Every structure is written in structure tokens, then in C-alpha cells.
């Protein structure tokens, strides 16, 4: 199972634990610097510097994902710590399972500060068989079957962490009433992110 760190809720050596405090409750994640070093460094540095403090989840689509990390709350903003967009860090060890922490982008190698948390609870049966045929590892296909997720985003968005506590908060946020462009009618705010290394 060591190959697929998302399948283990314990924080392993080399992983980083972060707690995201929101006005809807807390979510705890473990991050994977061995899998996505630049992405994790970007997120952790932003978290420590307070970059994400006060930023909202500007796009919420129930049974798909919640997206945040944009200081402009438009979906168009946000910068990386590297001064520009940075490259994708795809891996055959991390997948867009339910609860995955993944980078939002506008195409290949356009990562900035925006991220999303996967919240799709069920993968259709016909898609699961396509995953098997497509060469996805069996433990991951099984996890998609048990937990849900968005496998069509694999190898398109960098997965750099996984929720390990606070799924009820994730669900509460996902069930927020939204208006145009999937923006919550009442702000869902990231108050702070604590990094426990």
C-alpha cells in the first residue's frame, strides 16, 4: 500500500499534515512532498505566509468538488511562490479519489495558488471497468469504487494531498447553496491553514 499513500489515513514519514480552518469547520490533510515536491512547497509556503487566510471557496459543485485558493475569488487569480505558473507533477501513485487535494489549472503547466478538493461520492460502474481496461492500478480502481472520485481528472490535475479528517466539513461546504458560476451565496472562508511538519 506504500505506493498509494491516499489509501492510508495515517501520516507517514515524509508526509506533511495540515489543518485547514474554515468558517464551516476544520479539514485535515496529509501532503505528499515525495510525489509533488514543488506543488507541496507552494501550498505550504502560502499556508505559512497567510496567503490563503480569508480567501473563499469561490466555486462549489456538490458531488464534484470545492475550489478555493484565489485571492480575487473570480477563478482567474492567484499566484505561485515561484513568480509564475509552474509545471504539473503527475504521478502514478496519486489519484483524484474522494477527498483528494488537487491543483486547479487552466491547461497544462498553469499551476498557481488555486486548488480543489474532490467530493464526488460515486464513480459509475461503467467508468470503473473503463479504468481497469485503461490500466489504472487495481487498488485504485477499488478505491474509486468504494470512496468515489473524479478519475477523468487523473494526469490532468496534480494531486498533492488527501483529506484524513473533516469529511463532514467537506460535505457541509459542498452542500452550500450557490448562485451563478457555482459561487456560494454565503461566503465559505478559509480562516487559516496550520502546517504541522
UniProtKB/Swiss-Prot annotation:
It comes from the Bacteria. Gene3D superfamilies: Cyclophilin-like. GO terms for molecular function: peptidyl-prolyl cis-trans isomerase activity. SUPFAM superfamilies: Cyclophilin-like. Its EC number is 5.2.1.8. It catalyses: [protein]-peptidylproline (omega=180) = [protein]-peptidylproline (omega=0). Residues 14-195 form the PPIase cyclophilin-type domain. The keyword Transmembrane does not apply. Belongs to the cyclophilin-type PPIase family. This is Putative peptidyl-prolyl cis-trans isomerase. It comes from Staphylococcus aureus (strain COL).
Amino acid at each position: 500500500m506504500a505506493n498509494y499513500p491516499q489509501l492510508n489515513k495515517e501520516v507517514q514519514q515524509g508526509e506533511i499534515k495540515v489543518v485547514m480552518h474554515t468558517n464551516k469547520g476544520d479539514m485535515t490533510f496529509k501532503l505528499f512532498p515525495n510525489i509533488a515536491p514543488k506543488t507541496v512547497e507552494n501550498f505550504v509556503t502560502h499556508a505559512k505566509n497567510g496567503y490563503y487566510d480569508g480567501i473563499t471557496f469561490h466555486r462549489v459543485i456538490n458531488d464534484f468538488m470545492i475550489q478555493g485558493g484565489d485571492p480575487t475569488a473570480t477563478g482567474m487569480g492567484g499566484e505561485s511562490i515561484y513568480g509564475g505558473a509552474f509545471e504539473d507533477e503527475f504521478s502514478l501513485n496519486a489519484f483524484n479519489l474522494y477527498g483528494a487535494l488537487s491543483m486547479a489549472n487552466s491547461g497544462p503547466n498553469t499551476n498557481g495558488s488555486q486548488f480543489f478538493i474532490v467530493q464526488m461520492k460515486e464513480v459509475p460502474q461503467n467508468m470503473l471497468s473503463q479504468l481497469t481496461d485503461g490500466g489504472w492500478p487495481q487498488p485504485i480502481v477499488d478505491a474509486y469504487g468504494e470512496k468515489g472520485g473524479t478519475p477523468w481528472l487523473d494526469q490532468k490535475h496534480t494531486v498533492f494531498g488527501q483529506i484524513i479528517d473533516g469529511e463532514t466539513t467537506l460535505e457541509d461546504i459542498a452542500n452550500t447553496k450557490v448562485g451563478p458560476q457555482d459561487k456560494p451565496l454565503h461566503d465559505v472562508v478559509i480562516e487559516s491553514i496550520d502546517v504541522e511538519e
